[in-house]
Amino acid sequence: MWPSLSNELFPPPTEVWLQTVSSDPEAQGWGAWGRTEKTSLVPSAGSDKEAEENEDSSFLLSLLEPENLAKSPVYNQELEAIRLKLWTMEHAEVLPEPPSVQRKATEEERAEARELLSPETIGCFFPGAPKENVEADHRSVYVGNVDYGGSAAELEAYFSPCGEIHRVTILCDKFSGHPKGYAYIEFASKSSVQAAVRLDESTFRGRVIKVLPKRTNFPGISSTDRGGLRTHSSSRAAFLQGSLQRKPRLRPHGQSRGRGRASPWFSPY
């Protein structure tokens, strides 16, 4: 049997307590909140948030207005920089160069024209080639088919009857160091070149040598081994013209190019 609860532990409610509970809903506990009060509080909180968001958006939009942008220091700096750049461009187009600058540029152009038309530089068609190198080439000869065992002293002794020799150069391979089989001989005067050319097709160390005047190497022009100068563009044009003018040769029916024997009608070009 459970003990009976006495009235001393749970006294009956008084009238004062009942009046307090009826006037104060919080004293009644969680179940005392009415639906009407809950629904009334929720919209009020949402309206406050919406009002705050509207205020923030209106504040940000107000910053983009021209009046507020003009008050911003960054906007003023960028605007001043743009104005300064425009002012510089306008004055650069309007204001001419000072007379001293124009006079100096004109004098420099005239000096360059005089230098190009002077008698000393008329013979040099390419200003990029040094004048000393051109003069040395005019006093030099090319010697081809030289024996690999020949020395500079032997070449100097062989060409010494033609005139005074300043320099003998034997070209060697830069990787192996072996001679390439040709040399250049520089004389003291141009008249010695004509005498050296007479030794063309003579025998030096048991080999027939080739002696020709040396030609200056200019930029943009290729030269063969004494085969003459020709530009790259002219050689390409000649090749294209020759390939277009050639007519294809037709092979008789039944003949084809085989591996073992070439057809007499086949031409690689």
Swiss-Prot record:
Boundaries of every RRM domain copy: 139-216
GO biological process, one term: maternal-to-zygotic transition of gene expression
Record keywords: Cytoplasm, RNA-binding
Single GO cellular component term: nucleus
UniProt subcellular location: Cytoplasm
Pfam family, one: RRM_1
SMART domains, alphabetized: RRM
Main location per the UniProt record: cytoplasm
Top-level taxon of the source organism: Eukaryota
Record-linked InterPro entries: Nucleotide-bd_a/b_plait_sf, RBD_domain_sf, RRM_dom
Stretches for region Disordered: 26-54, 240-269
MF term (GO), any: RNA binding
SUPFAM superfamilies for this protein: RNA-binding domain, RBD (SSF54928)
Regions of compositional bias (Basic residues) in chain numbering: 246-260
The protein's role, per its UniProt record: Binds the poly(A) tail of mRNA.
Name recorded for this polypeptide: Embryonic polyadenylate-binding protein 2
